[in-house]
Regions:
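N-terminal low-complexity, acidic/polar interaction/targeting segments
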Residues: 1-181
Length: 181
């Protein structure tokens, strides 16, 4: 998916990152329409792009594969009715609180990230932002992306962020005991 006038692209993950030139069968069918925010030329000659996800999509059909993959997609729209439910609100609140705890307890994450998390107003943006920045396998991130609805995505995000927080606490506890010995 590409729209040159709006600098948007379709982003999908590969099932196996070792495949150099993936075919349509080597890609997950769920992806994200993303806006290109910045294109960076790296010192090693490679190019990196900074993107912001806008909405989810599902690949329906291959249109062409040269010079790049071109596909027909179906946009996946959020059901905003769920966002008003109290369980959903509490789940989002828990995600935000746990993300802030991880930031505060992990010396490798800049403290400004806590400010950024606290100031995200959109529930779906928070869930997507936290999910994309967690240290998860591509397969686990794909599970979150492929969830049927925003409530299910929020619960999966909370499950994974709680596991990440438990690992961080255990790691910090081990390092503290080693220092004290």
């Amino acid at each position: 998916y590409s729209n040159k006038s709006k600098n948007t692209i379709g982003v999908v993950a590969q099932k196996d990152k070792k495949i150099e030139d993936p075919s349509i069968n080597d890609l997950y069918e769920m992806g994200t329409v993303a806006q290109i925010l910045r294109v960076l030329k790296m010192p090693d000659g490679s190019t990196t792009i900074i993107i912001q996800g806008k909405k989810r999509f599902k690949i329906d059909d291959l249109i062409s594969n040269l010079p790049y993959l071109k596909v027909k997609i179906s946009s996946i729209f959020e059901n905003n009715k769920e966002k008003k439910e109290s369980e959903f609100k509490l789940t989002v609140e828990s995600i935000k609180e746990t993300a802030v705890k991880i930031i505060n307890e992990n010396p490798n994450i800049p403290s400004e990230a806590s400010f950024a998390i606290k100031n995200i107003q959109s529930d779906s943006f928070l869930i997507n932002f936290v999910s994309s920045n967690m240290n998860l396998s591509v397969n686990d991130k794909q599970k979150i992306l492929s969830s049927k609805n925003i409530s299910e995505r929020a619960l999966l995000c909370l499950k994974y962020i709680n596991l990440e927080y438990q690992k961080l606490e255990l790691k910090n506890d081990i390092q503290s005991r080693v220092r004290n010995d």
